Amino acid sequence: MGEACAGAGCPPGEVVGAIQELRLKDVTVYRDWTGDSLADLAAHLLTTHHAHARTELERLAPLMEQVTQVPNPELSDLRVHFTELRSHLESHLMHEEQIVFPYLLAMEAGEVPATCFGTVANPIRTMQEEHDQVGRLMRRMRDLSSDFTAPEGACESRRRLFKGLADLEADLRQHLHLENNVLFPKAEALEHSKIPECASPPCFLIEF
């Protein structure tokens, strides 16, 4: 955490305090999934985070088009990054749902299916790299929108757009954390127990 805070210019004490405050407000956000099965965690990711990302990207797209009709370099750049984020995420979610998750569930059920990707570490590394790209895009969008804060006198559409982007970012943080630091390590550990030569997983921290 110290390195991440230093890189973002945030005092660690403030970050810890904010986390503790959020835990008091909504403890369900911080449920410990480490003891759950891959099947239960994957189901949660699909029905909660994957569904939310798709719904919000579709909902925010027309708002983005409406808001960026007004000539403004930063808003135009924001639209470019949002379009890239949407394309990137939709492809990423499909890859997970059609390839990665089915393999993980089959492996947990006692199988080690034949694959075109070798060890599960290979698609997981790809997923983590794509998660990093999501983080970079969201950071850039936050910079372009003054931390998703609409200026005084901004229209209602712009306020709704920025609020939606902030909410999307918050959900993506939890989404990517659960995959990078719970689902993927559990999957690699399970595969390692079945195929001992597979490497142990590292821990990843997405910086938004």
Q: Where do the PLM segments sit?
A:
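Small-residue-biased structural context
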Residues: 1-208
